[in-house]
Structure formats: C-alpha cells, structure tokens
C-alpha cells in the first residue's frame, strides 16, 4: 500500500467509526466494524495522519467478485486525493485476490463520488430504487471489470 494506506486493525475501529459517523446519514455501528475485523480481517484499509484515522475503505470478497462496502474520508481531509488513493488500493487488492470484477452502490446525488468511480474505470450499470433507508434515495450501481486487464 502507498501513501500511508495500511490494513485496518481492531484498534482502528473507533477512529474508523468516527469517520463513518461524520460521513454517512445511516452509519454502521462500532460493533459492525469490530465484527468486520474478526470476520473479514484482510479487506478494510485505513489512511491516518498524526491525529488518527482520516479515511477508510472496505471490500467484501464474494466468490470471484468484490463488493466495495464503504469508502469515506473526514470532511477536513476531502479534496486531497485520499478517496482516490483508498479506492486505487482496493482495486489493487481485488486484482491480487484474482477477482473478476468489483461493484459498489452510491447515492445518485453523490456526484463527487460518482465522478471518482468513473475516473477509475467503474461503469454505471443500473439503479437500486429507494435503496437508502434515511430518505429512500436511489443507489447508482457501478461495476469494474478486472478480468482481462493487464495486471
């Protein structure tokens, strides 16, 4: 991993949860992140500075596909390329695992995230109607094909 990105440990859970609370209307619980560390210990990554965790990203490995569960950067650190660095790291992990493709959902209104996903090669493939529970917003579905790419 580059630019200070490293695998998440159970000791990072509180810092990751703080970023999650700041970033999402329906955040995961601290218990959920701690459970991820025991059930999925190799698929969450963080970036930190001297003050602690400033961003994180997660990946579920399901058969030959990867599902990006969440990616977030503290508001004070947005616009510095950390989200792109985290997503690029997850793509590298997916390739190392031999995944065929990666997918994610994002709020249709989240233009900055959608722009980033498209910049990194993700293709819009559809919509999940009323996906987000807080306001029934639709989710845009994106896929990135890894199979056949030059690794």
Question: What label would you give each PLM region?
Answer:
Residues 3-76, 87-89, 93, 97, ...:
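Acetyl-CoA-dependent GNAT
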Residues 74-76, 80, 108-110:
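Active-site acidic-Proline motif in GNAT/NAT acetyltransferases
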Residues 84, 137-146:
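Accessory recognition modules or surfaces
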Residues 87, 110-113, 130-135:
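Short glycine/proline-centered loop/turn elements that form peptide/ligand docking sites
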Residues 94-105, 128:
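Conserved GNAT acetyl-CoA-binding A-motif
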Residues 105, 118, 123-140:
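Conserved catalytic-core motifs of GNAT/GCN5-like acyltransferases
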